[in-house]
Amino acid sequence: MASTTPPDAPTASRALPDWIAAVVTFLSSGAVLVLEVVGLRLIAPYVGITLQTNTAIIGFALAAIAIGAWAGGAAADRTDPRRLIAPLLVAGGALVVAVLPLVRFAGELLTGAAAGNVLLLAAVAVVVPAALLSAVPPMVVALQLGSLAETGSVVGRLSGIGTLGGIVATFATGFLLVAVLPSSVILVGTGILVVLVGLALAVLLRRSAPGVTARLPVGLLVLAVAMPLLAAVAPTPCERETSYHCARVVADPERDSGRVLVLDTLRHSYVDLADPTYLEFEYVQAIASVTDATAPAGAPLSALHVGGGGATLPRYLAEVRPGTVSRVLEVDPGVVEVDEQELGLRTSPELEVSVGDARVALGSEPAGARDLVVGDAFGGLSVPWQLTTSEALELVDRTLADDGVYAVNLIDHPPLDFVRAELATLRSVFPEVLLLARAPVLAGEDGGNVVAVASRRPLPADSIAAAMADRGLAWQVAAGEELTAFVGDAGVLTDDFAPVDQLLTPYASAAG
């Protein structure tokens, strides 16, 4: 007898309960976005946070989503999805956990912001687990389709649920989880949750369709157990993970009271716990020399510090210029905690620390209130571009008194395009600009830290050079025609166009 069942009749016996289909789709999509957000933080200690690292993570995540969705849909046409969904969840969750040790082992070999390092680490961080998990939603869709008449509603509903999962995961991770949990905990927790859901689904499917679904391969179960163990023994660059950095404090073996603040892979600050007048880094000595030459000896200053680090200069000024009032703008509350707990920082009415974005805080500074603004927010791998532009420098200028001075630490390496562009930008705002650097840097043969000095008033170049010499600092001062030749045809950075990540030539071992 011919069948009377129409070809598009519902196949409800294959379908998952709607709520289970929704949970699986929501979770698999959300886990991919957690991986994307946390993946950027995982690779940052090795290659920095730049436009390139953001682009690489986002690009590889999108590629993995596309590949996974295509492959998952194709596989669902050839194989009963009930055989594949649970193994994919278990494998994908285990590999989410595996990302942690894989990035850390690979990062030991790929430190530095070279494009190849960025691309390789980004690929390790997201591609395989994101592709596996992205194969799950199209399989769930195929399983839930009962008839052609339902195609639009089923596909639309599950697509919306998957998108919602990604949105919730993105906001929850970026605004909540990274503020209260280390990246390692977020990643391992997400992976384990996905594995557990996969195991539970495998049990459910074996009970509901024993002749269709197979047992999970033993190797897959071993992988799920082994990955958290591998994550536990992987090398870590972090003594403490802050909102923006891997931070650690290293004792100076040659100076009992010396401490180095290391953020990610770079030495950012040196603090002598017993002697705040001891300045280890040359660029800090150069900025101190600027204050020696531009303000009467011992006279208190009103100073604003854009970037906190170890708060070396605020403590130095408080010691050598009693009565100095300093406000430190630091974006990372974790760095402030390290300063207070391990580097002996004590805040007071004379030394205030404000946590938040410096560009925003500059807008709230009273006009003409500061004798000195120190810029020390730029690292050797990445630059907060919003502090480099002419609009940002106009805020600095507004903050300064008529005879105030802006001294900013910059880091770059040949061809020094970023330094040249920032000097051009400074010259577009301030009538007086100097560059302090070692002779090979001024000749374009070497790189590292340099200090740019800007003001509305004439700057005493000879006095600054003498002050640096008195400290034994072999730096020179470039001014006038020499500075013009150094800047060349570099363009001015603006809020509309500031390609600092492309201009900067990083070098991983530069002291930040």
Question: Predicted regions span which residues?
Answer:
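Composition- and surface-driven signal marking solvent-exposed, interaction-prone regions
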Residues: 191-192, 388, 421-422, 465-468
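The AdoMet/dcAdoMet-binding core of the Class I SAM-like
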Residues: 90, 278, 285-405, 414-417, ...
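Phosphate/oxyanion-binding active-site loops and adjacent basic polyanion-contact surfaces
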Residues: 133-136, 279-283
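Aromatic-acidic/polar surface patches that form glycan- and anion
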Residues: 16, 276-280
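Soluble small-group transferase modules, centered on the S-adenosyl donor enzyme superfamily
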Residues: 209-270, 276-277, 293, 437-512
